[in-house]
């Protein structure tokens, strides 16, 4: 739609190129078909999503940008779209996107990134964790915040006390809120990979100019417990059939905006969030 909608602007059409950040060979192929790509070039690709390094807490080693993953075959890396003649490229991460003015579209992207959940207790902000069945009595489970799924060996529990993640992430989010609101919160859900990626996108725009549009399920925030699982078009418990359901969580747009507002000396501005209706009406 974006290519068709801008096809009538000759100078824009001649200047634009399309860059997908996509690690799935199957989805790359679908994207190539959607854009009616020809002259396709392929190369070997790795499996798995490599999230940007979490800039807030070095504890998250799974967010490092240099994680080694196995090769799984060939996937699209370059082609040309017959819709408007634009060159199309695929990348494993933002770091390989070339410099230059950039328009970034994040459509239902951030809601698929991992989240961490925290709960205020008399021990402080504890983190919700997933573990094997602890064997606690029902009274003990209730006291420790455990949540068991019948027929499964996994359960959600609370950490014994504050974790490094709660020390860094929770305090950072709460300081942007009015004191009364911050003191009243009992649950908090945050997405470290989303915050880290938004920070990197802001740096890219600051350096090369452009804009980023995020379209997603979400709210101003802060959010509590929005993580949900969908399997066969039905909602299921997130611990039921792990690995077989699609997981998503609402986007904390206020948390993303906070990243921009706290960047020292940045020329990047952040607007919104607004509803999809408001956006479309403003465009006429």
Predicted regions and their residues:
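Class I S-adenosyl-L-methionine
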Residues: 59, 87-284
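SAM cofactor-binding core of SAM-dependent methyltransferases
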Residues: 1-94
